[in-house]
From Swiss-Prot:
One of its GO terms (cellular component) is extracellular space. It comes from the Eukaryota. The modification 4-hydroxyproline is found at residues 100, 106, 115, 118, 121, 133, 136, 145, 151, 166, 169, 172, 190, 193, 199, 202, 208, 217, 226, 253, 256, 259, 271, 286, 295, 304, 313, 319, 322, 328, 346, 361, 367, 370, 391, 394, 400, 406, 439, 442. This is Collagen alpha-2(I) chain. The keyword Ligase does not apply.
């Protein structure tokens, strides 16, 4: 909407142009003048209307460097003109022919006119011949990572890997049923091996077994094919200001920008010496005739004054916009294969694999020798039924059975697995050229081609007829501001201008002495305006008076006729970079450049973080069952170890004949998961054919290119539990590597602080005033002087109102596919952001259903009333959890000390009245209650958030660029995107050093005198002339009449900042702004004091998704938009609120990661009941997450298990003293005085002690076991004496000693007792201690008694301590 000032300016422009037209008509019809001489050759006519866009030309080769451009306008000359100059005015009427005038003397050449506006582009010329390929460009910056390539074909099976390290011993199994006592048998001699039996007939498949427990998490699947492009996401929030990009090549000179806001008034500089005389001003109005002075003598010209001192450096401009993105660099050669990475953390649980084929029955093992007879024991009570034993090893393959009767036709089988992908065939031979097709329909108008290289200058054309004024072209995009030039030296005076009309010669006056500068008198009041006087006789030309003050800027006059083009000036010195111009409109997408030459191979980058897990691959074919191993003794069940490396699949066996139908076997166990097959293209579903026998393996083909990582193979059969070996010694440091190649130039460093402003230089001495020169003829009005240097950058203006969306442009052609860019370097993790402000209090959620009543506990003593907690942030409504199993009743705690009074909290909501309970006495220890019935199944949980990205796989070799695809059809017009929010203002750059002054230009040749032109319209008012010498004091004139009120002047510069005003009253609360950018994870706050339990609420509706409890247009972004209702800040506030809501949800549902740890494994199980057991991060003491610890969470029992460091104390003849038979503490005496430690990598011992203390407070049950490996040493019961005198002693955390017999609270139990007699062989005893006093664990030391002999050795394995 036009403002009042804009409307008034338009009206004045219209009136001025109308007056100018009328004045020219009157002058033309006044009198007929004589015929003039033949006029000079006219300018080239205006360009014709624009032609249709031609087809895209082939990109030409880089042209030769162009000639030096014309000198740019100095300073902010362009700022004095509007961005679009007026077109030529309408052609005037032809006046009557005047009488021939006398030929005037040819005037000297005028100043070079400013360059005219660029005309509309002409029609596109025909496409030039394809030039030779240009030189290879510089290597571009790394492109964005390309899409992952298709997985390679499956490689040849690798060799058998080395045997893995033995796993840690597992937790003890359940105690088996005691068998009946056998009769005492005599020890028989071992029998000879029996003859190998005939293979039995293969049995029929057994009934399917029960569904097995959830398997361990599968390995990360191979990356799936890229999905279809998703819909355009909403505009992201404003990112942080990126680092300044490299300085781009200088863009083409932009159109003159609109005049910027006037800068603030700069400080007054030191006065420089007088410069050379400026151009002559306009002829002033005739002055009053002064008194005739005595004639003076002409003086000689004075010497030019000394050059003024250099001014202070100007303020550096804001950083420029990032340059255009470079063309993609050439594809680098494949880097060397990186070293194998460390084993990653176990991934989340994979889905259960399908059952494998049933293995063949194993052969019957040889009978073992009978064992020694045991003493007859008391018959034990019947134990629980043990778990099914492991299946025996498969038997040898049986002979083929007799051929059965043909069976009935079976149903069609399921579709077989897809075959492996065939090798890519060689490229076919190029076929012969086809016949010419018939001419096609005329295509759509192609986009505008590239501008061709400038042609040779043609001969001057004949003067064409003056064309109609062309339609104003659309304003082009605002180009980037050119670099700011250094002010050049003041050039020589230009050639003399054309002589003006001769004035009457004034009488020569005497030169008066230079008077001192008088003080300015006070301004007189304006008198009333007098009547206009009669026109007086033209007086003699007075001396040039002092230059008047600058007038207001006049309205732009009508455009004059264009002058002849001046000679191109020499190329100026490149100036400093100017302030960045506003961003130009987005240009059309250019065609991709040709690929550059391949760059050198870059150094191998550091291993990036692992990517997100891909989808599961197809199931592979099952491998052949391996040969049976000898059955080892079953070890104790341990914690699940880290997943081992995959075994290689065996070769495929031949297909056997169909056997006789056997009896129904017992339910089989889940088969092993097959190796992943290569992803084949889906074929049509056919009926299953008979399976052919496998042919012999062909010779190994040449190694193919490295494929993408396949799925992880099957887990091989577990080997026997070995003992962990001692840690190897540290290796010698490697030799110093060769010096690497010089790295690429780093990014610009941060801007240093602005240096102090240098002191102003001293003023040069004033030159002696020269004697007055003789009076010259009055010159014509001089051309507009060069504009002054640019003022300092003004404060940024307010944001303009968004313009209406432009019409959609035509769809561009699809560009050629660029080569795949190199993988970008991995960015470093951002630092944790500051904690965000607390969110708004949520509305009260609907009440939940009443829970099932728990068993009544024994009444505890009445505790002291705790301090009221702070009002917490509203939590999101949780889903209904599974009802928990009722826990056993704990012992009553002692009366706690009264805590300090808390700060006064806000008043809470009024609770429902509670039931008055009578204070009961402290009860005795109750027996543990029975387990409650299992709760109903909860509703399925929502899909979890996307996990943290896994470690990045090894860098694959760069794929070859694909062939050029066909040109796609013209796309539909896209919708105009929403305008993005304004970017943040970048930091001010540092003050650059002053560049050297340019060399003085060569004086130009004097031009040919031109014909006298018609009298021009009055020019713009010139700049102030130099201060003249003070004239003789004139007589005081009569007071003039008051003048009419002039028009309002242009807005003055901003005044200096006034003193700060008083604080205003607090305004109304603003509307809620948009959400800001999501902050990083805030640190965990300290736990508040527990509040009193509230009454159960009424039942709520079944849980759906989380609903944010604000109704309607609470966010301003949801309200109907009006031009004044929305500000950029509002979006940030809205985004901040939404981000805070997300963060609160994250706090309420911890993820078990290092950045978002849970407090205990129980919290994780409650938040994610669908998760499986594994290693997770917890932070029992809450607060900062830097001291979070990694533990094993057993979700089946809800236990949190922490491993000892180290877990194994190696084998040794620890102690040599067979005489002193006393308990010797391993950690205190034998092991160098160090107790068992429970540390986690990255956490100090003190921090770990704090975490363990919190774990003990949070738990009400703890357990731990220790395996005592012995050779000729008694650990628990001595079989010879039948007593426990030689049993070991354990030391708990609170210095309590745990013994084999005595008080039941401090006695441990033994699960396996192999160290009960001395057999000169290694045995083991597994000791377990469970307690409902978690402060007693973990175990810190062990003291055996039966050690010290030369043949006695022990080794310890400390199991994890588990809290519940």
């Amino acid at each position: 909407m036009l403002s009042f000032v804009d409307t008034r300016t338009l009206l004045l422009l219209a009136v001025t142009s109308c007056l100018a037209t009328c004045q020219s008509l009157q002058e033309a019809t006044a009198r007929k003048g004589p015929s003039g001489d033949r006029g000079p050759r006219g300018e080239r006519g205006p360009p014709g209307p624009p032609g249709r866009d031609g087809d895209d030309g082939i990109p030409g080769p880089p042209g030769p460097p162009g000639p030096p451009g014309p000198p740019g306008l100095g300073g902010n000359f362009a700022a004095q003109f509007d961005a679009k100059g007026g077109g030529p005015g309408p052609m005037g009427l032809m006046g009557p022919r005047g009488p021939p005038g006398a030929s005037g003397a040819p005037g000297p050449q005028g100043f070079q006119g400013p360059p005219g506006e660029p005309g509309e582009p002409g029609q596109t010329g025909p496409a030039g011949a394809r030039g030779p390929p240009g030189p290879p460009g510089k290597a571009g910056e790394d492109g964005h990572p390309g899409k992952p390539g298709r997985p390679g074909e499956r490689g040849v099976v690798g060799p058998q890997g080395a045997r893995g390290f033995p796993g840690t011993p597992g937790l003890p199994g359940f105690k088996g049923i005691r068998g009946h006592n056998g009769l005492d048998g005599l020890k028989g001699q071992p029998g000879a091996p029996g003859v190998k039996g005939e293979p039995g007939a293969p049995g029929e498949n057994g009934t399917p077994g029960q569904t097995g427990a959830r398997g361990l998490p599968g390995e990360r699947g191979r990356v799936g094919a890229p999905g279809p492009a998703g819909a355009r996401g909403s505009d992201g929030s404003v990112g942080p200001v990126g680092p300044a990009g490299p300085i781009g090549s200088a863009g083409p000179p932009g159109f003159p920008g609109a005049p910027g806001p006037k800068g603030e008034l700069g400080p007054v500089g030191n006065p420089g010496p007088a410069g050379p005389a400026g151009p002559r001003g306009e002829v002033g109005l005739p002055g009053l005739s002064g008194p005739v002075g005595p004639p003076g003598n002409p003086g000689a010209n004075g010497l030019p004054g000394a050059k003024g001192a250099a001014g202070l450096p100007g303020v550096a401009g804001a950083p420029g916009l990032p340059g255009p993105r470079g063309i993609p660099g050439p594809v680098g050669a494949a880097g060397a294969t990186g070293a194998r990475g460390l084993v990653g953390e176990p991934g989340p649980a994979g889905s259960k694999g399908e059952s494998g084929n049933k293995g063949e029955p194993g052969a019957v093992g040889q009978p073992g020798p009978p064992g020694p007879s045991g003493e007859e024991g008391k018959r034990g009570s019947t134990g629980e039924i043990g778990p099914a034993g492991p299946p025996g090893p498969p038997g040898l393959r049986g002979n083929p059975g007799s051929r059965g009767l043909p069976g009935a036709d079976g149903r069609a089988g399921v579709m077989g697995p897809a075959g492996s992908r065939g090798a890519t065939g060689p490229a076919g031979v190029r076929g012969p050229n086809g016949d010419s097709g018939r001419p096609g329909e005329p295509g759509l108008m192609g986009p505008r081609g590239f501008p061709g290289s400038p042609g040779n200058i043609g001969p001057a054309g004949k003067e064409g007829p003056v064309g109609l004024p062309g339609i104003d072209g659309r304003p082009g995009p605002i180009g980037p501001a050119g670099a700011r030039g250094e002010p050049g030296n003041i050039g020589f005076p230009g050639p003399k201008g054309p002589s003006g009309d001769p004035g009457k010669a004034g009488e020569k006056g005497h030169a008066g002495l230079a008077g001192a500068r008088g003080a300015p008198g006070p301004d007189g009041n304006n008198g009333a305006q007098g009547p206009p006087g009669l026109q007086g006789v033209q007086g003699g030309k007075g001396e040039q008076g002092p230059a008047g003050p600058p007038g207001f800027q006049g309205l732009p006059g009508p455009a004059g006729t264009a002058g002849e083009a001046g000679k191109p000036g020499e190329r100026g010195i490149p100036g400093e970079f100017g302030l960045p111009g506003p961003a130009g409109a987005r240009g059309e997408r250019g065609p991709p450049g040709e690929s550059g030459a391949a760059g050198p191979t870059g150094p191998i980058g550091s291993r990036g973080p692992s990517g997100p897990p891909g989808p599961d691959g197809n199931k592979g074919e099952p491998g052949v069952v391996g040969a049976p191993g000898t059955a080892g003794p079953s070890g104790p069940s341990g914690l699940p170890g880290e997943r081992g490396a995959a075994g290689i699949p065996g070769g495929k066996g031949e297909k056997g004949e169909t056997g006789l139908r056997g009896d129904i076997g017992s339910p089989g166990r889940d088969g092993a998961r097959g190796a992943p097959g290569a992803i084949g293209a889906p074929g049509p579903a056919g009926a299953n054919g008979d399976r052919g026998e496998a042919g012999p393996a062909g010779p190994a083909g040449p190694a193919g290119p490295r494929g993408s990582p396949g799925e992880r193979g099957e887990v091989g059969p577990a080997g026997p539990n070995g003992f962990a070996g001692p840690a190897g010694a540290a290796g010698q440091p490697g030799a110093k590597g060769e010096r690497g190649t010089k790295g690429p130039k780093g990014e610009n460093g941060p801007v240093g602080p602005t240096g102090p402003v240098g002191a102003a230089g001293p003023s040069g001495p004033n030159g002696p005033p020269g004697p007055a020169g003789s009076r010259g003829d009055g010159g014509p009005p001089g051309a507009t002087g060069f504009p002054g240097a640019a003022g300092r950058t003004g404060p940024p203006g307010p944001s303009g109102i968004s313009g209406p969306p432009g019409p959609p442009g035509p769809a561009g052609k699809e560009g050629l596919r660029g080569p795949r860019g190199d993988q970008g370097p991995v960015g470093r993790s951002g630092e944790t952001g500051a904690s965000g402000p607390p969110g708004f209090v949520g509305e009260k959620g609907p009440s939940g259903e009443p829970g099932t009543a728990g068993p009544p506990g024994t009444p505890g003593p009445q505790g002291l009333l705790g301090a009221p907690g702070f009002l917490g942030l509203p939590g999101s409504r949780g889903e209904r959890g599974l009802p928990g199993v009722a826990g056993s009743v704990g012992e009553p705690g002692p009366l706690g000390i009264a805590g300090p009074p808390g700060a006064r909290g806000p008043p809470g909501n009024v609770g429902n009245p509670g039931v008055n309970g009578a204070p009961g006495e402290a009860g005795r220890d109750g027996n543990p209650g029975n387990d409650g019935p299992p709760g109903r199944d909860g509703q399925p949980g929502h899909k979890g958030e996307r996990g943290y990205p896994g470690n990045a796989g090894p860098v694959g070799a760069a794929g070859a660029p694909g062939p050029q695809g066909p040109v796609g059809p013209v796309g539909k017009h896209g919708n105009r995107g929403e305008p993005g929010p304004a970017g943040a203002v970048g930091p001010a750059g540092a003050v650059g050093p002053r560049g050297p002054s340019g060399p003085q230009g060569i004086r130009g040749d004097k031009g040919e005198p031109g014909d006298k032109g018609p009298r021009g319209l009055p020019g713009l008012k010139g700049h102030n002339g130099l201060q003249g010498l003070p004239g003789l004091a004139g007589h005081h004139g009569d007071q003039g009449a008051p003048g009419a009120v002039g028009p309002a002047g242009p807005r003055g510069p901003a005044g200096p900042s006034g003193p700060a005003g008083k604080d205003g009253r607090i305004g109304q609360p603003g509307a809620v702004g948009p959400a800001g950018i999501r902050g990083s994870q805030g640190s965990q706050g300290p736990a508040g004091p527990p509040g009193p339990p509230g009454p159960p609420g009424p039942p709520g509706p079944s849980g759906g998704g989380y609903e944010f409890g604000f109704d309607g247009d609470f966010y301003r972004a949801d309200q109907p938009r009006s031009p004044t209702s929305l500000r950029p800040k509002d979006y940030e506030v809205d985004a901040t609120l939404k981000s805070l809501n997300n963060q609160i949800e994250t706090l309420l549902t911890p993820e078990g990661s290092r950045k978002n740890p849970a407090r205990t494994c129980r919290d994780l199980r409650l938040s994610h009941p669908e998760w499986s057991s594994g290693y997770y991060w917890i932070d029992p003491n809450q607060g900062c997450t830097m001291d979070a610890i990694k533990v094993y969470c057993d979700f089946s029992t809800g236990e949190t298990c922490i491993r000892a460091q180290p877990e194994d104390i190696p084998v040794k003849n620890w102690y040599r003293n067979s005489k002193a038979k006393k308990h010797v503490w391993v950690g205190e005496t034998i092991n160098g005085g160090t107790q068992f430690e429970y540390n986690v990598e990255g956490v100090t011992t003190k921090e770990m002690a704090t975490q363990l203390a919190f774990m003990r407070l949070l738990a009400n049950h703890a357990s731990q076991n220790i395996t005592y490996h012995c050779k000729n040493s008694i650990a628990y019961m001595d079989e010879e004496t039948g007593n426990l005198k030689k049993a070991v002693i354990l030391q708990g955390s609170n210095d309590v000693e745990l013994v084999a017999e005595g008080n039941s609270r401090f006695t441990y139990t033994v699960l396996v007792d192999g160290c009960s007699k001395k057999t000169n062989e290694w045995q083991k005893t597994i000791i377990e201690y469970k307690t409902n006093k978690p402060s007693r664990l973990p175990i810190l030391d062990i003291a055996p008694l039966d050690i010290g002999g030369a043949d006695q050795e022990i080794r310890l394995n400390i199991g994890p301590v588990c809290f519940k």
